[in-house]
């Protein structure tokens, strides 16, 4: 029997740089996530987690920052534990410019974790940079989020880190609203505005394409069945060809008017179909629902 494959993502960085968004993204992709875990407890956490499901693959993402204790720069212990359990471990550091961090704190009106020291916000940011410098230096990747909005950051995490780069083709099925623009990174874009719109059904208007009532409505529409059948046949043919052409990942986007019902339903259905066909690296991203 093939031994289980485990992966561990350590997410660290500056407060306000997008660490929470990144961790939530991994959670949405079925990673087992924990935030602000004290560094000294990480080896015990890994041992316990792997014993719970020792026969299955484990994908774990853990957030560590200045709230995780005074030993955040001591990386040897968790690296040693990860290696001992044959875990592929990666450290990602999220950063942003001082100007960006100041603006984000002003917009959210949140307190900086170091504000209890009596520091001004610029002083707290400067001290945090100093305290987290060893983590930044040790990271496999430093992600500067200064120019990212939430949607762009989530997409970046999905395509660059959450979907593994291997000989397997990674698939991202995305939904969007045409009125907010077509995703520029999409490899295939399908227009669902021609399909019946659940928005005009009063009992469905407040729901999304993830809800069973909307799914039932869509599956009763002959045009929807035909649309899905033809797109499924197209993608089944060409995704296999793209993998043979050594592509790493493909983004398939579905658009409708509001990005809430039809496009979400189609993205979810195609992701489910892809998993049933044996594609192991599959994710969904619903831009207008985030």
From Swiss-Prot:
One family name in Pfam for this protein: RapZ-like_N
- Indicate which residues the UniProt annotation says bind GTP: 65-68
Entry keyword Phosphoprotein: no
Q: Which residues bind ATP?
A: 13-20
Citing just one GO molecular function, the answer is:
ATP binding
The question of whether ATP-binding is a record keyword is answered with: yes
Q: Which domain of life is it from?
A: Bacteria
**InterPro entries reported for this sequence:** P-loop_NTPase, RapZ-like, RapZ-like_N, RapZ_C
Provide this UniProt record's keywords sorted from A to Z. Answer: ATP-binding, GTP-binding, Nucleotide-binding
Question: Which family does the record claim for this protein?
Answer: Belongs to the RapZ-like family.
Its biological purpose is as follows:
Displays ATPase and GTPase activities.
> What name does this protein carry?
Nucleotide-binding protein PD_0634
Q: Which organism is it from?
A: Xylella fastidiosa (strain Temecula1 / ATCC 700964)
